[in-house]
Amino acid sequence: MSVEKWGLFEVELKGPAEGNPFVDVQLSAEFKNGDTTIKAPGFYDGDGTYKIRFMPSVEGEWSYKTQSNADALDGQMGSFECGTPSAANHGPVRVRNQHHFGYEDGTSYFSFGTTCYAWVHQGDTLEEQTLKTLETAGFNKLRMCIFPKDYIFNKNEPAYYPFEKQGAGWDFSRYDIAFFQHLEKRVAQLGALGIEADIILFHPYDRWGYAKMQHEEDYAYLRYVVARLAAYRHVWWSLANEYDFMLKDKPMEVWDHFFEIVQENDPYDHLRSIHNGNVTMNYDHTKPGVTHVCVQNWDVKRMREWRAAYGKPVIDDECEYEGNILRNWGNITARELVHRYWICIVYGGYAGHGETYEHPEDILWWSKGGVLVGESWPRLKFLRGLVEEGPAEGIEPFAGSFPWGRTAGGGRGNYRLIYFGEHQPKRFGNGLPEEGRYEADVIDTWEMTVETLGTFEGQEPIELPGRPGLALRIRPVEG
């Protein structure tokens, strides 16, 4: 059998079905290729079937041997060949250049994410429509919950539940296999679209009791989820959406331990973050288990502050949503969301998109997916294209308070990207390269146009159209 590098190899075994296999049976395997040895956890997949999933990161022949407390599963051996990755397979996303990201093969990755919290709980018709929308929307990351959601516009029952029923409640020690097979089917489909699955492990919006499980039940759930999903190269772990709203039941030391469990059980070291609710309740993102910063904050001009405070990549995944609902977090204009996104990018960070327009059947993109009806997403797709044409290592913000506390400016080398936002200067000269010739383009961030102004040299101010929503791009001229 052959699997591409960073693909998914699966070992399937038959073992005991009696008792509670989720609790009673431990299973793992050691995979070896030359001097490389990786231990991967296994999991129970129902009907006496056990699986171990593995993501090979080295080409060549791999061998494996299982370890288990069940005789039928212990000492099973095999091998497979790992081949070259396909053209669209760049491996997992990693932190690169301290404040940015990149795929493991060295290809740049600039996070342009959107939000569909409960999309995997809406039934096949709507879920397939969501995937169809994502094919062309231009996003390369999706924030999504494992657990179903109980919240405004989210009162429908899910198609599947994560645990087996026990009387009027749930047996939190027995996982519903159909639920998890459905979840991983959708995760795999995101991967086929080139979209990173930012998987939210806990959230407070719950009427089923999943947010109030005992700590040991939480720990077992985390181990099971990681065993099932970690071998998908495009998975990220978000420990929680709005963790601080659950501190009564899950105090800070428990969240710290959640990070430890995920890290210990994920042999591929996928990206890990945690999301705050109250803007004053950022997690301590300097902790070693946190790979990058995820914040909820409307004040995007603090991006440089967060970068400096945490020393890691920063994504303001919830800088409020384009929409028209009653809640303030969901009724900013498309222009305002595009404006905030540009500020985050030019200040050397990243942002997240969401859409919350009222719908007669409560099908709001931010939670249930479906179709995009707003105006920000094509402009964010346009911005992504501009960023991907820029420095492969990412943009670094300009230092100092003037003018960069009001006008967002950043770059790398003699590349510059200056976003004026609400300002409308007729001439601008700050931050231009001191030496060499360069080409200047004026970008209309709403109309999605790029106009070349000419070739310049030195720091003489450049004439501009003088209207809001413009950006200035500077690129060095070779020769």
For every predicted segment, state its role.
Residues 286-361:
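Catalytic-core region of carbohydrate-active enzymes that cleave or remodel glycosidic bonds
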